C-alpha cells in the first residue's frame, strides 16, 4: 500500500542546488541534523521543519571519465522567508563541506 502526501508551498522562497559525490542518505541525515523530520520514503524525499522544507528531488550518475563516475543529487530548499532560506542553505553547506588533505 502506498500513501501519497501532497505538500502545498505557497509563496515561499526557494532555491535548488546540486551536490556531487555525497551519499544521498547522508544528505537526508543533514536535514534531520538541522531539525527537519523526514516526511516521505521515496523521491522526492521531503524533510520538513516549522520554518523550512527540503526536498531531495533526484539522483543521477555522472561519468567524469569512462571509469570514474560520481553521483549528482539535486536538492530544493524552501523556507518561510528569505533570511531563513539563506540560513538553512548556509548551515546545510557547512555539513556538505569536504576538506581534502
Residue spans of the language-model regions?
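C-terminal basic regulatory modules in eukaryotic proteins
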Residues: 63-101
Amino acid at each position: 500500500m502506498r500513501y501519497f502526501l501532497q505538500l502545498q508551498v505557497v509563496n515561499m522562497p526557494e532555491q535548488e542546488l546540486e551536490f556531487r559525490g555525497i551519499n544521498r542518505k547522508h544528505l537526508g541525515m543533514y536535514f534531520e541534523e538541522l531539525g527537519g523530520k523526514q516526511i516521505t520514503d521515496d523521491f522526492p524525499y521531503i524533510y520538513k521543519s516549522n520554518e523550512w522544507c527540503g526536498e531531495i528531488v533526484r539522483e543521477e550518475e555522472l561519468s567524469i571519465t569512462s571509469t570514474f563516475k560520481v553521483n549528482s543529487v539535486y536538492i530544493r530548499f524552501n523556507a518561510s522567508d528569505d533570511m531563513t532560506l539563506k540560513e538553512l542553505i548556509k548551515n546545510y553547506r557547512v555539513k556538505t563541506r569536504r576538506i581534502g588533505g
